[in-house]
């Protein structure tokens, strides 16, 4: 519904591609009926890489996913990211340089950030910076997060 509202306020050509499956897909498909929203289902490998390559920006609207590996994937694919200032995104996204962080839970601010995305040329420059930043990170941080979660679940103190 928010995307449809954004389209009304935007003069630029927009297209939303939703990758993945989940319990809300049927409901979202019904809401988007007749619009230009594309639902790809779950993708991996080359198919997923093609979707990233065709995008100008990546919007990560989750307020519950803590690891956010898709944020890393998008940035590694050269996309600036719009996300909430929460969990993994806040660690990787540099405000106005590699993407934008909206205050956690403030949906109106998040939507306004999307409406105000800059032109494609600026997005490409930001995506290049995002890719460069993420190349230096590697997978150490998400692996460490996962390790900490396992230790926490097992109620064992993690090694430093």
Per-region residue spans from a language model:
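Conserved acidic donor-binding segment of nucleotide-sugar-dependent glycosyltransferases
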Residues: 95-96, 100-107, 115-121
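Short glycine/serine-rich donor-binding loops of glycosyltransferases
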Residues: 68-71, 89
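A charged, aromatic-enriched C-terminal amphipathic alpha-helix characteristic of glycosyltransferases
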Residues: 125-152
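Short hydrophobic beta-strand element within catalytic cores of glycosyltransferases
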Residues: 80-83, 93
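Aromatic "clamp/platform" in nucleotide-sugar-dependent glycosyltransferases that forms part
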Residues: 63
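Nucleotide-activated donor-binding/catalytic signature segment of Leloir-type glycosyltransferases, i.e.
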Residues: 26-46
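Short alpha-helical donor nucleotide-sugar binding micro-motif in glycosyltransferases
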Residues: 42-43, 50-55
């Amino acid at each position: 519904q928010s995307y449809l509202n954004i389209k009304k306020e935007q003069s630029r050509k927009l297209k939303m591609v939703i990758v993945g499956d989940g319990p809300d897909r049927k409901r979202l498909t019904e809401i988007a009926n007749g619009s230009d929203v594309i639902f790809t289902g779950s993708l991996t490998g080359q198919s997923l890489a093609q979707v990233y390559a065709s995008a100008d920006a990546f919007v990560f609207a989750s307020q519950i996913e803590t690891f956010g590996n898709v944020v890393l994937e998008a940035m590694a694919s050269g996309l600036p990211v719009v996300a909430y200032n929460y969990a993994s995104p806040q660690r990787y996204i540099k405000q106005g340089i590699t993407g934008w962080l909206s205050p956690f839970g403030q949906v109106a601010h998040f939507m306004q950030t999307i409406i105000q995305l800059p032109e494609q040329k600026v997005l490409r420059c930001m995506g290049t910076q995002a890719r460069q930043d993420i190349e230096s990170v590697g997978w150490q941080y998400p692996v460490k997060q996962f390790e900490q979660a396992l230790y926490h679940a097992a109620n064992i103190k993690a090694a430093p």
